[in-house]
Regions:
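Polytopic membrane enzymes that build or remodel cell-surface glycoconjugates and lipids
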Residues: 2-258
C-alpha cells in the first residue's frame, strides 16, 4: 500500500481549508515581499519639509473641527489629520509609528486590488501585474515615504479600493447591501483628500465600460439607470463637498503663514 505524502495536507489542516487558502498563496507571498522591500525603505526614511507642519498641528491643536477640516494650500484631508493626531497622541514624535500605519494601510489596499482583479479575470498573473505596477511605481514610492503625501493619498486609495470592491460585488449580484457600502466608502474617500472627486468618474466608468455581471458593456445610459439613486446621492454629496471646499473652513493663505 502506497501513500502520496506530497498531496497530503499538513497536520491539523483539513483538505477543504487547504483548498480554500490555495488561491491566496501568490497574493500572500507578493504582499510579504512588498512588506520587506517597502518596509526597509520606509523605516530608514525621515520627516522633512511640510511633514513638520502636520506634526506641529497635531501636537498643539485639540481634536476640534478647526483642526480636522483645516486646509493646507487649499487641500483638505480630514482622515489624514485624524490619523496624525491619534498617532502623535499615542506615539509622540515616533516616525516608526507613522510608517507602520502607512504600511498597514497600503498592504490592505493592494490586497483588495489583487482580489478585485482575480475575481474579475480569474488570472493570478493579471492580479500580480495589477499589484506590481502601483506597488513599485514611483508614485507608490512617493506616497510611501513622504508623510505629507501619505496623509492624503493612502487613506484615499484604501477607501476607493473598498468602494470599487463593493461595487464589483453589487454588479455581480452578490447578496448584501453592496451599493450602500460602495457609496459610504466613496464618501470616506472624498473626506480623505479634497482632490479625490474624480473617483466618482472612475466608479461610473467601471459600471458603464466594463461587462461586469452582464455579457457586454452597459454604456452610459444603462449604467445610470442601473442605480440612479446611488449616482444622484453621490453627485449631490460631491457637489456639497466641493462647495464647502470653495468656501473653506480656514483660509489656506493664513494657515501657510503659521
Amino acid at each position: 500500500m502506497t501513500t502520496d505524502s506530497a498531496a497530503r495536507p499538513a497536520a491539523g489542516v483539513t483538505p477543504a481549508a487547504a483548498a480554500r487558502w490555495l488561491p491566496y498563496r501568490p497574493m500572500i507571498l507578493a504582499l510579504f515581499g512588498y512588506l520587506v522591500i517597502r518596509g526597509t525603505v520606509m523605516l530608514n526614511g525621515y520627516l522633512y519639509a511640510d511633514d513638520f507642519a502636520f506634526r506641529y498641528w497635531a501636537d498643539t491643536f485639540g481634536l476640534t473641527p478647526e483642526y480636522v477640516f483645516r486646509s493646507y494650500y487649499g487641500h483638505v484631508q480630514p482622515f489624514g489629520h485624524l490619523a496624525q493626531w491619534f498617532l502623535q497622541a499615542a506615539f509622540p514624535g515616533s516616525f516608526t509609528a507613522l510608517m507602520l500605519w502607512t504600511l498597514l494601510m497600503q498592504v490592505v489596499t493592494f490586497a483588495l486590488l489583487w482580489r478585485i482583479v482575480l475575481r474579475l479575470t480569474g488570472s493570478d498573473l493579471a492580479a500580480f501585474l495589477a499589484f506590481l505596477v502601483p506597488a513599485f511605481s514611483m508614485f507608490g514610492f512617493e506616497t510611501g515615504v513622504w508623510w505629507c503625501e501619505i496623509t492624503e493619498t493612502v487613506p484615499y486609495g484604501l477607501f476607493m479600493m473598498i468602494s470599487i470592491w463593493a461595487l464589483v460585488r453589487a454588479l455581480q449580484g452578490d447578496a448584501g447591501r453592496w451599493w450602500l457600502w460602495s457609496g459610504l466608502a466613496f464618501v470616506a474617500a472624498m473626506m480623505s483628500i479634497s482632490k479625490g472627486a474624480v473617483g466618482l468618474l472612475v466608479l461610473f466608468m467601471i459600471v458603464a465600460a466594463l461587462p461586469i455581471g452582464v455579457p457586454r458593456r452597459r454604456g452610459i445610459i444603462r449604467a445610470f439607470r442601473l442605480a440612479p439613486l446611488y449616482w444622484l446621492v453621490l453627485a449631490l454629496l460631491l457637489a456639497l463637498s466641493l462647495g464647502g471646499l470653495g468656501l473653506g473652513c480656514v483660509d489656506a493663505a493664513i494657515l501657510s503663514e503659521e
